[in-house]
């Protein structure tokens, strides 16, 4: 098969980017979230189109709003590899990279990958939420919610990133048992203007697992996000976390794709 040739460039054209990403909004939820401010101004969008067409075939997002940049990819594998090759010297020297399984051949050509964490991407049309008939109570958290119990709960889960300012979005719910916070669910991406949200920071206190607390928090969160205009709800979960995957399936989430998450050093 003859290799395709691409027109490779950097773009700030949101309409072009949105057209590409909307082809799979669950898989592209993180990238769609970065089309809104203040995140958009902290992004470089490196893209490829084929055959003289204006329509994009692939994109690599370099997000510089963190102390360590993040690199994400979306689109046709050959287009993404062409973008990485063209901008090879402009890629971050060190970054967190997240890319779908189909791009796993391209990234090692340009980065040394320190580890590989396999994640499932799952998605739900908010209108298809399967709300359990027997659902525990979960409360919306706000900036007036005492912060110490939240921080204490996340202390046992160091992989989660939480800042108190995130509570201002109204996109966090908590469940309590005997007055103690035992579960919480929040968001990594909240972009009603793009119709998407990505759930995250979902944890349950070890002693309270298997009692429906996280299910309640997640269900109430999805309902709140839908009310804000987020019709597509996505999440990413460790591929070996069977308990969490089962919880999300019961709520109506379905598997979409596998992505790899890694810390990467440019070659």
Q: PLM ranges: what are they?
A:
Residues 51-52, 63-135:
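Acyl-donor-binding surface of acyltransferase catalytic domains
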Residues 114-125, 236, 249, 254-267:
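Conserved catalytic-core motifs of GNAT/GCN5-like acyltransferases
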Residues 77-87, 204, 210-227, 232, ...:
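Conserved acetyl-CoA-binding loop-helix of GNAT-fold acetyltransferases
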Residues 63-64, 161-171, 176-203:
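A conserved beta-strand-loop-helix scaffold within acyl/acetyltransferase catalytic domains
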Residues 25-44, 152-178, 182:
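Active-site rim helix/loop that mediates acceptor-substrate recognition in acyltransferases
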Residues 2-8, 19-21, 25, 29-87, ...:
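Conserved donor-binding loop and adjoining core beta-sheet/short helix segment
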Residues 1-29, 120, 125-160:
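Short amphipathic alpha-helix that is part of the acyltransferase structural core
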Residues 98-104, 235-245, 261-267:
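Conserved beta-strand-loop-alpha-helix junction that forms the acyl-donor binding cleft
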């Amino acid at each position: 098969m003859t290799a395709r040739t691409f027109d490779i460039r950097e773009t700030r054209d949101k309409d072009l980017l949105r057209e590409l990403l909307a082809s799979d909004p669950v898989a592209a939820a993180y990238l769609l979230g970065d089309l809104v401010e203040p995140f958009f101004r902290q992004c470089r969008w490196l893209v490829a189109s084929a055959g003289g067409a204006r329509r994009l075939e692939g994109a690599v997002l370099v997000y510089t709003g963190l102390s360590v940049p993040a690199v994400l990819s979306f689109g046709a594998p050959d287009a993404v590899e062409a973008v990485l090759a063209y901008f090879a010297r402009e890629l971050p020297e060190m970054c967190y990279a997240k890319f779908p399984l189909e791009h796993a051949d391209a990234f090692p050509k340009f980065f040394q990958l320190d580890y590989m964490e396999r994640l499932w991407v799952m998605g739900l049309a908010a209108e298809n939420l399967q709300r359990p008939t027997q659902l525990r109570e979960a409360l919306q958290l706000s900036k007036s919610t005492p912060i110490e119990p939240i921080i204490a709960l996340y202390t046992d889960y160091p992989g989660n990133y939480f800042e108190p300012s995130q509570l201002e979005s109204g996109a966090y719910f908590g469940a309590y048992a005997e007055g103690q916070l035992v579960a919480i669910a929040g968001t990594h991406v909240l972009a009603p203007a793009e119709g998407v949200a990505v759930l995250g920071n979902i944890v349950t206190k070890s002693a309270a697992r298997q009692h429906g607390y996280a299910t309640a928090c997640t269900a109430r969160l999805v309902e709140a996000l839908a009310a804000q205009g987020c019709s597509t709800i996505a999440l990413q979960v460790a591929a070996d976390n069977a308990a969490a995957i089962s919880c999300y399936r019961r709520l109506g989430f379905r598997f979409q794709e596998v992505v790899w998450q890694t810390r990467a050093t440019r070659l």
